[in-house]
Amino acid sequence: MGQKVNPVGFRLWTHGSHGSVWYSKSCDYAKTVAEDYFVTKYVESSFAHIGISKVIIKRKGASCDITLHCMKPGLIIGKKGADLESFRLKLNKKFGFVPSLNVVEVKKPNSSAVLVAKSIAFQLEKRSSFRRVIKKAIATVMRESDVKGVKVACSGRLSGAEIARTEVFKEGSIPLHTMRADIDYWVAEAHTTYGVIGVKVWIYRGNIFRV
Protein backbone atom coordinates (compact mmCIF):
# COMPACT_ATOMS: atom_id res chain seq x y z
CA MET A 1 0.00 0.00 0.00
CA GLY A 2 2.87 2.36 0.74
CA GLN A 3 3.79 2.29 -2.96
CA LYS A 4 0.32 3.25 -4.19
CA VAL A 5 -1.10 6.00 -1.96
CA ASN A 6 0.00 9.61 -1.55
CA PRO A 7 2.65 9.56 1.23
CA VAL A 8 1.50 12.90 2.64
CA GLY A 9 -2.21 12.01 2.80
CA PHE A 10 -1.35 8.56 4.16
CA ARG A 11 0.30 10.17 7.21
CA LEU A 12 -2.19 12.94 8.00
CA TRP A 13 -3.57 11.06 11.00
CA THR A 14 -0.11 10.62 12.57
CA HIS A 15 1.90 13.80 12.04
CA GLY A 16 0.60 15.55 8.92
CA SER A 17 -1.41 18.77 8.66
CA HIS A 18 -4.14 19.89 6.29
CA GLY A 19 -3.80 22.89 4.03
CA SER A 20 -7.28 24.06 5.06
CA VAL A 21 -8.19 24.63 8.71
CA TRP A 22 -11.85 25.44 9.35
CA TYR A 23 -15.25 24.08 10.30
CA SER A 24 -18.34 24.49 8.14
CA LYS A 25 -21.97 23.45 8.04
CA SER A 26 -22.70 20.54 5.73
CA CYS A 27 -24.66 22.76 3.33
CA ASP A 28 -21.64 25.08 2.86
CA TYR A 29 -18.90 22.44 2.95
CA ALA A 30 -18.58 21.76 -0.80
CA LYS A 31 -18.62 25.47 -1.61
CA THR A 32 -15.86 26.21 0.92
CA VAL A 33 -13.67 23.31 -0.27
CA ALA A 34 -14.00 24.48 -3.89
CA GLU A 35 -13.18 28.06 -2.89
CA ASP A 36 -10.05 26.91 -1.03
CA TYR A 37 -8.97 24.91 -4.08
CA PHE A 38 -9.35 27.84 -6.49
CA VAL A 39 -7.70 30.29 -4.07
CA THR A 40 -4.71 27.94 -3.70
CA LYS A 41 -4.37 27.50 -7.46
CA TYR A 42 -4.65 31.26 -8.01
CA VAL A 43 -1.94 31.97 -5.43
CA GLU A 44 0.40 29.33 -6.89
CA SER A 45 -0.08 30.60 -10.46
CA SER A 46 0.38 34.24 -9.42
CA PHE A 47 3.70 33.51 -7.71
CA ALA A 48 4.92 30.62 -9.88
CA HIS A 49 8.23 32.41 -10.50
CA ILE A 50 8.91 32.78 -6.77
CA GLY A 51 8.34 29.24 -5.54
CA ILE A 52 5.41 28.67 -3.20
CA SER A 53 5.90 25.52 -1.12
CA LYS A 54 2.66 25.61 0.86
CA VAL A 55 -0.58 27.60 1.14
CA ILE A 56 -2.49 27.30 4.42
CA ILE A 57 -6.02 28.71 4.65
CA LYS A 58 -7.60 29.24 8.08
CA ARG A 59 -11.20 30.36 8.45
CA LYS A 60 -13.06 31.44 11.56
CA GLY A 61 -16.49 32.93 11.04
CA ALA A 62 -16.25 35.60 8.34
CA SER A 63 -12.48 36.05 8.70
CA CYS A 64 -9.96 34.24 6.50
CA ASP A 65 -6.21 33.98 7.10
CA ILE A 66 -3.93 32.83 4.27
CA THR A 67 -0.32 31.89 5.04
CA LEU A 68 2.14 31.59 2.16
CA HIS A 69 5.33 29.57 2.64
CA CYS A 70 7.89 30.62 0.04
CA MET A 71 11.62 30.91 -0.69
CA LYS A 72 11.80 34.70 -1.10
CA PRO A 73 9.19 36.58 0.98
CA GLY A 74 10.53 39.96 -0.13
CA LEU A 75 9.35 39.39 -3.71
CA ILE A 76 5.78 38.86 -2.47
CA ILE A 77 5.71 41.59 0.18
CA GLY A 78 7.29 44.28 -1.98
CA LYS A 79 8.41 47.71 -0.83
CA LYS A 80 6.72 48.52 2.50
CA GLY A 81 4.17 45.76 1.85
CA ALA A 82 2.76 47.41 -1.29
CA ASP A 83 2.79 44.25 -3.44
CA LEU A 84 1.18 42.18 -0.69
CA GLU A 85 -1.61 44.72 -0.26
CA SER A 86 -2.15 44.83 -4.03
CA PHE A 87 -2.48 41.05 -4.16
CA ARG A 88 -4.91 41.12 -1.24
CA LEU A 89 -7.16 43.48 -3.21
CA LYS A 90 -6.92 41.16 -6.24
CA LEU A 91 -8.17 38.28 -4.09
CA ASN A 92 -11.05 40.46 -2.91
CA LYS A 93 -11.99 41.32 -6.49
CA LYS A 94 -11.79 37.72 -7.71
CA PHE A 95 -13.27 35.80 -4.76
CA GLY A 96 -15.33 38.38 -2.90
CA PHE A 97 -13.54 38.43 0.46
CA VAL A 98 -10.60 40.31 1.95
CA PRO A 99 -8.21 37.84 3.61
CA SER A 100 -5.38 38.44 6.04
CA LEU A 101 -2.13 37.51 4.27
CA ASN A 102 0.95 36.21 6.06
CA VAL A 103 4.24 35.30 4.39
CA VAL A 104 6.62 32.76 5.94
CA GLU A 105 10.12 32.06 4.62
CA VAL A 106 11.08 28.45 3.93
CA LYS A 107 14.33 27.99 5.86
CA LYS A 108 15.48 24.87 3.99
CA PRO A 109 14.14 24.96 0.41
CA ASN A 110 16.35 22.03 -0.62
CA SER A 111 14.47 19.70 1.75
CA SER A 112 11.04 20.71 0.40
CA ALA A 113 9.69 18.24 -2.17
CA VAL A 114 7.46 20.94 -3.66
CA LEU A 115 10.30 23.32 -4.44
CA VAL A 116 12.65 20.56 -5.63
CA ALA A 117 10.02 19.12 -8.00
CA LYS A 118 9.15 22.55 -9.40
CA SER A 119 12.84 23.34 -9.90
CA ILE A 120 13.42 20.11 -11.83
CA ALA A 121 10.32 20.69 -13.98
CA PHE A 122 11.41 24.27 -14.74
CA GLN A 123 14.85 23.11 -15.91
CA LEU A 124 13.34 20.35 -18.05
CA GLU A 125 11.21 22.98 -19.78
CA LYS A 126 14.46 24.79 -20.60
CA ARG A 127 15.52 21.60 -22.47
CA SER A 128 18.26 20.63 -20.02
CA SER A 129 19.38 16.99 -19.82
CA PHE A 130 17.02 15.22 -17.42
CA ARG A 131 19.75 12.96 -16.01
CA ARG A 132 22.08 15.85 -15.26
CA VAL A 133 19.28 17.93 -13.73
CA ILE A 134 17.99 15.14 -11.48
CA LYS A 135 21.43 13.97 -10.31
CA LYS A 136 22.37 17.54 -9.45
CA ALA A 137 19.08 18.02 -7.56
CA ILE A 138 19.59 14.79 -5.58
CA ALA A 139 23.14 15.80 -4.64
CA THR A 140 21.90 19.20 -3.46
CA VAL A 141 19.08 17.67 -1.39
CA MET A 142 21.34 15.09 0.25
CA ARG A 143 23.65 17.86 1.49
CA GLU A 144 20.90 18.97 3.91
CA SER A 145 21.55 17.70 7.44
CA ASP A 146 17.94 16.61 8.08
CA VAL A 147 17.53 14.61 4.84
CA LYS A 148 18.00 10.83 5.08
CA GLY A 149 16.97 9.87 1.55
CA VAL A 150 15.50 11.13 -1.71
CA LYS A 151 13.84 9.54 -4.73
CA VAL A 152 12.94 11.18 -8.04
CA ALA A 153 10.82 9.58 -10.77
CA CYS A 154 10.61 11.17 -14.21
CA SER A 155 8.04 9.95 -16.76
CA GLY A 156 7.29 10.87 -20.36
CA ARG A 157 9.10 11.31 -23.66
CA LEU A 158 12.47 11.85 -22.04
CA SER A 159 15.02 13.58 -24.30
CA GLY A 160 12.40 13.52 -27.07
CA ALA A 161 12.28 9.72 -27.31
CA GLU A 162 9.52 8.22 -29.46
CA ILE A 163 8.38 5.88 -26.69
CA ALA A 164 7.57 7.27 -23.25
CA ARG A 165 9.30 5.67 -20.29
CA THR A 166 9.94 6.16 -16.58
CA GLU A 167 13.38 6.74 -15.06
CA VAL A 168 13.82 6.48 -11.28
CA PHE A 169 16.78 7.93 -9.35
CA LYS A 170 17.26 7.18 -5.67
CA GLU A 171 19.77 7.85 -2.92
CA GLY A 172 19.47 6.95 0.74
CA SER A 173 16.41 5.40 2.39
CA ILE A 174 12.71 6.01 1.58
CA PRO A 175 10.61 3.88 4.02
CA LEU A 176 7.16 4.33 2.47
CA HIS A 177 5.57 1.70 4.73
CA THR A 178 6.75 3.30 7.98
CA MET A 179 3.95 5.48 9.33
CA ARG A 180 6.17 7.59 11.61
CA ALA A 181 8.53 8.42 8.73
CA ASP A 182 8.51 12.11 7.82
CA ILE A 183 8.22 11.88 4.03
CA ASP A 184 7.55 14.92 1.88
CA TYR A 185 6.10 14.27 -1.59
CA TRP A 186 5.11 16.31 -4.61
CA VAL A 187 4.26 15.91 -8.29
CA ALA A 188 5.15 18.56 -10.87
CA GLU A 189 4.71 18.76 -14.64
CA ALA A 190 7.15 20.01 -17.24
CA HIS A 191 5.47 21.13 -20.47
CA THR A 192 8.02 20.56 -23.22
CA THR A 193 7.85 20.58 -27.02
CA TYR A 194 7.70 16.76 -26.93
CA GLY A 195 4.78 16.67 -24.49
CA VAL A 196 4.24 16.66 -20.73
CA ILE A 197 6.90 15.14 -18.48
CA GLY A 198 5.85 14.19 -14.97
CA VAL A 199 8.25 14.65 -12.05
CA LYS A 200 7.67 12.94 -8.69
CA VAL A 201 9.85 13.69 -5.67
CA TRP A 202 10.01 11.87 -2.32
CA ILE A 203 12.19 13.29 0.49
CA TYR A 204 12.70 11.37 3.74
CA ARG A 205 13.59 13.53 6.76
CA GLY A 206 13.83 10.94 9.52
CA ASN A 207 11.23 9.53 11.90
CA ILE A 208 8.84 11.50 14.10
CA PHE A 209 8.25 10.16 17.61
CA ARG A 210 5.38 11.61 19.63
CA VAL A 211 5.21 11.10 23.38
Swiss-Prot record:
GO terms for molecular function: mRNA binding; rRNA binding; structural constituent of ribosome. GO terms for cellular component: cytosolic small ribosomal subunit. Keywords: Ribonucleoprotein, Ribosomal protein, RNA-binding, rRNA-binding. The keyword Zinc-finger does not apply. InterPro entries: KH_dom (IPR004087), KH_dom-like_a/b (IPR015946), KH_dom_type_2 (IPR004044), KH_sf_prok-type (IPR009019), Ribosomal_S3_C_sf (IPR036419), Ribosomal_uS3_bac-typ (IPR005704), Ribosomal_uS3_C (IPR001351). Residues 39-107 form the KH type-2 domain. One of its GO terms (biological process) is translation. Coiled coil: none annotated. Part of the 30S ribosomal subunit. Forms a tight complex with proteins S10 and S14. Belongs to the universal ribosomal protein uS3 family. Binds the lower part of the 30S subunit head. Binds mRNA in the 70S ribosome, positioning it for translation. This is Small ribosomal subunit protein uS3. It comes from Neorickettsia sennetsu (strain ATCC VR-367 / Miyayama). The lineage of its organism: Bacteria, Pseudomonadati, Pseudomonadota, Alphaproteobacteria, Rickettsiales. The gene is rpsC.
